[in-house]
């Protein structure tokens, strides 16, 4: 099989994930896009490992080993990421990334989407970042 | 202890006293007075011991070089000859008297600790100047005196007069010190040493290339320090300081430093005929001009200040005739009687509550309020007017005698022209001196009008000091003129018949004419009531004086003179009075020549700074501001925007890297 | 290999290649739908399709162990987690008009540009490279296991520590603090949850 097929597919998947990360509003959708990018990398790793295991005399199968590690780390990442998103959602009442703008100049902590308990936390955060 | 150790202790003790006074002034007020008086007194005793051991014989020289300092070595050197030993005694005596007097005069002054410490520091610096055998070390003392003078003149810094006067004193003396420093360096470069003995040796072997240039440069510093024309204008204004400061600094010691310096290096000046003539002309102009100005002043201390300038003129005149013995003789007697005059004037100002002669002339019985000041001041004024047998007579006659000696061509030391200049100016000044001394005495003690206010007795310590100083004023000249030649160069200091008769004669004429004029004018006093009196006459003397100085300008419209028709000086001077009262417009000339151009330059610089330099500065600030505002718009807080920009940049960089790698 | 690659042209694909291409198209399409659909739950479901397609691709590349791990962990665990996440953040069921942020066109530009650059570079570099898929499977469980426990034991164990840390971290992050719990209690008293109303 031509190496170009998995490589091109991997590149396209990666850019699709990239688009998702940059364009999606909901934090969980962004996490899904990150998963897509990670999988694109995995595909690349597997394809090159298969190619190299034929081409080289001795191989450590590093591509497959790293793929397994990536999958494990992706699992950990999605766990932590979801926990953060849940915490943010609990504090702010939203999980929209483009509404979390505490680092901007002139940021108004009392946005229309924040409810009463969120105000205090947001103000604290604004103070911390200021 | 060796003589050298004693001599080193003399400047060191007041210095330590000053340091201790400054350190303990706030925490231990009880120690301030002993710390002020005792080190100075000890220094006086040591100075007497040093003089006794030196005994007018060979000069004591001691040198140590702490560290190499570059091309010309700076050495800690002592050079004690007869001049140094005797001048040190004078400095010690006056400083001790002034410190004692100050304990009474500034009795309630909250700034007394720093004042006393500065006076001690000043005394120490003067001792350093007197004893130092190295010109660089001498310069250190010279400049310390300058800065102490600045602080002490500005002691009443609440009054604008004192602030202006201290700044003026500092700037004018510094104006002279710059050429002085250049002259010192030029001299040291030519000789290869700052040591006085080596310099005198080089002068004796005639190995100086530019004696005239060096002498003239040094003269500028001397003129500034000793208040000689044309750099004398700071001295009358410096009377805004407390009276003891005037007595110590502006009569007896600091202003004498310049004269003393020339006396030390006189052979150097003698090597240049031009310098001697300049010195003589300077002395003559100073003498006559200051005596005329003294006759027109209303402030009692300004009269004394101008008289100081005139007497310093006598000293420089004696130096111009190459007779430093006469100059230092006059320095010694003048130091005694001028200190006495100032201290007595301080008592009078306190008693009368004013420093204005016009106001005093309208007070009856002032002399009965201050009998000690009356008698001692009479003695001092007689000494000032050079009436025999008071001390001033002998020293002044020695000056006139030296001038006559040169004028008649009996010596090779100085040009005859210098002798004639000094002689004629000296005689004229003798006349004027007697006149203003008489005027001062008559106006202060022979006032008519309301009874003088009674503010109680003066502090005992102040009166005691007056009597201590009255002794040398009375007898120093008569006792010393035979002994002093052994200490000095050996020139005879005995008065000659011609000059004695002439000098005493013109002095008597001056006194009598002034008395006549006073008889003529004093009737007018009752018709024009005048008076500027301190607001708190019951306060301590320093407070009274400060208020009197501050009250003078509002009362009379001028700091120096008063519109008083009963003033005999006004009658004697006639049309000259108006000009003499303001010091012959020299301040106005300086204003036109120096102050205005400097101010114009300053405003030009300010304009350039504000309009040109600041434009660049503002632009340098504004441009980043604009850029920052532009960049700030990108900071939306949206993480996705940031990552988009980051990745776009990454893509661009990656493509560029690939293109470069493939050589496209 | 380069010599061998010369005999394999793109115009005469093998069966495996055809299968790879078809599955790849499905995977890519599912991925594009994942990042473009307006229904959040659908996005998660399309993600399942994309990840499953990738598992098939792994199989086609003879990496069977990776393929089953992919199915187990991604399709089985991660997607379920994401669905839980969507549920807990009360993601709306149905079409939501604001699924994409205003950054979309910038994102599209960046993505297309990077895709073009990557594809260009990759194709330029590997257009003649050929993977020999005949012979023993390169990614069979035996081979992978041997390499993993011979050469990669230490990173493997380190990874277990990392997973433990992530586990603890996730628990700590999602625990409610006392204050938050008090808020929750007080909010339970109000007739309707404000957040649901806002969303």
From Swiss-Prot, chain A:
Statement: the UniProt record of this protein carries the keyword Transcription: no
Gene Ontology biological-process annotations: ATP synthesis coupled electron transport
Catalytic reactions of this protein: a quinone + NADH + 5 H(+)(in) = a quinol + NAD(+) + 4 H(+)(out)
Record localization: Cell membrane
UniProt function note: NDH-1 shuttles electrons from NADH, via FMN and iron-sulfur (Fe-S) centers, to quinones in the respiratory chain. The immediate electron acceptor for the enzyme in this species is believed to be a menaquinone. Couples the redox reaction to proton translocation (for every two electrons transferred, four hydrogen ions are translocated across the cytoplasmic membrane), and thus conserves the redox energy in a proton gradient.
Subunit annotation: NDH-1 is composed of 14 different subunits. Subunits NuoA, H, J, K, L, M, N constitute the membrane sector of the complex.
The protein's name in its UniProt record: NADH-quinone oxidoreductase subunit K 1
Recorded name of the encoding gene: nuoK1
């Amino acid at each position: 099989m031509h190496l170009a097929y998995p490589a091109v597919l991997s590149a396209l998947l990666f850019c699709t994930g990239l688009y998702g990360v940059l364009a999606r509003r909901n934090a969980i959708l962004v996490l899904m896009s990150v998963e897509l990018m990670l999988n694109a990398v995995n595909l690349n790793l597997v394809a090159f490992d298969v190619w190299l295991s034929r081409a080289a005399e001795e191989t450590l199968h590093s591509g497959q080993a790293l793929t397994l590690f990536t999958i494990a780390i992706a699992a950990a990442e999605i766990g932590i990421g979801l926990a953060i998103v849940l915490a943010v959602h609990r504090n702010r009442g939203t999980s929209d990334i483009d509404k979390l703008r505490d680092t901007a100049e002139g940021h108004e902590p009392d946005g229309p989407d924040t409810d009463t308990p969120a105000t205090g936390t947001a103000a604290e955060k604004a103070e911390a970042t200021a | 202890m060796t003589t050298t150790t004693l001599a080193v202790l003399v400047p060191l003790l007041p210095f330590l006293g000053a340091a201790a006074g400054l350190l303990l002034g706030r925490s231990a007020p009880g120690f301030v007075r002993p710390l002020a008086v005792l080190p100075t007194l000890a220094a006086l005793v040591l100075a007497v011991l040093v003089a006794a051991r030196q005994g007018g014989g060979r000069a004591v020289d001691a040198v140590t070089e702490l560290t190499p300092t570059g091309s010309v070595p700076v050495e800690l050197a002592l050079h004690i000859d007869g001049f140094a030993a005797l001048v040190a005694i004078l400095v010690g005596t006056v400083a001790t008297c002034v410190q004692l007097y100050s304990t009474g005069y500034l009795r309630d002054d909250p700034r007394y600790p720093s004042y006393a410490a500065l006076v001690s520091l000043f005394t120490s610096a003067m001792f350093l100047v007197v004893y130092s055998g190295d010109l660089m070390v001498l310069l250190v003392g010279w400049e310390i005196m300058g800065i102490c003078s600045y602080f002490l003149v500005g002691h009443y810094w609440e009054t604008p007069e004192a602030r202006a006067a201290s700044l003026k004193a500092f700037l004018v003396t510094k104006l002279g010190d710059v050429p002085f420093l250049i002259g010192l360096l030029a001299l040291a470069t030519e000789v290869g040493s700052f040591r006085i003995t080596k310099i005198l040796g080089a002068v004796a072997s005639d190995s100086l290339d530019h004696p005239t240039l060096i002498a003239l440069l040094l003269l500028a510093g001397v003129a500034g320090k000793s208040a000689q024309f044309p750099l004398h204008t700071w001295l009358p204004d410096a009377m805004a300081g407390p009276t003891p400061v005037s007595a110590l600094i502006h009569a007896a010691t600091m202003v004498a430093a310049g004269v003393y310096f020339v006396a030390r290096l006189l052979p150097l000046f003698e090597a240049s005929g031009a310098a001697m003539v300049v010195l003589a002309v300077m002395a003559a102009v100073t003498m006559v001009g200051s005596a005329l100005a003294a006759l027109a002043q209303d402030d009692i201390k300004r009269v004394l200040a101008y008289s100081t300038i005139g007497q310093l003129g006598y000293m420089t005149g004696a130096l111009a005739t190459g007779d430093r013995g006469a100059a230092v003789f006059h320095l010694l007697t003048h130091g005694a009687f001028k200190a006495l005059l100032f201290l007595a004037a301080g008592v009078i100002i306190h008693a009368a509550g004013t420093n204005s002669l016009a106001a005093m002339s309208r007070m009856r019985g002032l002399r009965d309020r201050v009998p000690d000041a009356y008698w001692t001041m009479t003695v001092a004024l007689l000494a000032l007017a050079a009436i025999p047998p008071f001390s001033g007579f002998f020293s002044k006659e020695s000056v006139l005698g030296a001038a006559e000696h040169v004028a008649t061509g009996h010596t090779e030391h100085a040009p005859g022209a210098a002798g004639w200049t000094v002689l004629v100016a000296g005689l004229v000044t003798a006349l004027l001196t007697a006149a203003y001394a008489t005027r001062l005495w008559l106006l202060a003690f022979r006032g008519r009008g309301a009874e003088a206010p009674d503010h109680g007795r003066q502090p005992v310590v102040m009166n005691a000091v007056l009597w201590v100083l009255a002794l040398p004023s009375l007898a120093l000249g008569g006792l010393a003129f035979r002994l002093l030649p052994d200490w000095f160069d050996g020139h005879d200091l005995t008065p000659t018949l011609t000059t004695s008769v002439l000098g005493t004669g013109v002095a008597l004429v001056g006194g009598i004419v002034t008395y006549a004029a006073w008889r003529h004018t004093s009737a007018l006093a009752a018709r024009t009531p005048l008076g500027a009196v301190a607001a708190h006459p019951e306060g301590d003397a320093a407070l009274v004086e400060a208020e009197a100085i501050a009250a003078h300008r509002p009362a009379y419209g001028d700091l120096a003179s008063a519109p008083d028709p009963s003033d005999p000086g006004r009658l004697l001077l006639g049309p000259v009075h108006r000009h003499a009262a303001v010091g012959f417009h020299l301040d106005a000339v300086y204003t036109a020549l120096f102050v205005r151009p400097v101010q114009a330059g300053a405003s030009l610089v300010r304009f350039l700074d504000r309009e040109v330099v600041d434009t660049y500065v503002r632009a340098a600030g504004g441009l980043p501001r604009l850029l920052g505002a532009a960049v700030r718009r990108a900071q939306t807080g949206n993480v996705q925007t940031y990552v988009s920009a980051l990745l776009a940049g990454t893509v661009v960089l990656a493509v560029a890297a690939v293109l470069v790698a493939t050589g496209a | 290999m380069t010599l061998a690659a010369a005999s394999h042209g793109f115009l005469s694909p093998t069966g495996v290649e055809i299968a790879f291409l078809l599955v790849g198209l499905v995977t890519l399409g599912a991925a594009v739908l994942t990042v473009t659909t307006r229904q959040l739950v659908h996005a998660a479901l399309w993600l399942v399709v994309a990840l499953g397609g990738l598992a098939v691709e792994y199989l086609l590349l003879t990496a069977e162990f990776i393929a089953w791990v992919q199915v187990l962990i991604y399709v089985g665990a991660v997607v379920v987690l994401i669905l839980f996440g969507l549920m807990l953040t009360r993601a709306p069921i149905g079409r939501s008009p604001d699924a994409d942020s205003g950054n979309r066109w910038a994102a599209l530009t960046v993505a297309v540009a990077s895709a073009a650059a990557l594809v260009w570079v990759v194709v330029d570099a590997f257009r003649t490279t050929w993977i020999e898929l005949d012979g023993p499977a390169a990614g069979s469980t035996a081979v992978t296991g041997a390499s993993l426990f011979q050469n990669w034991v230490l990173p493997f164990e380190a990874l277990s520590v990392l997973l433990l840390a992530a586990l603890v971290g996730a628990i700590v992050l999602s625990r409610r603090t006392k204050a938050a719990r008090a808020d929750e209690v007080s909010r339970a008293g109000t007739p309707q949850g404000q957040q649901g109303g806002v969303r």
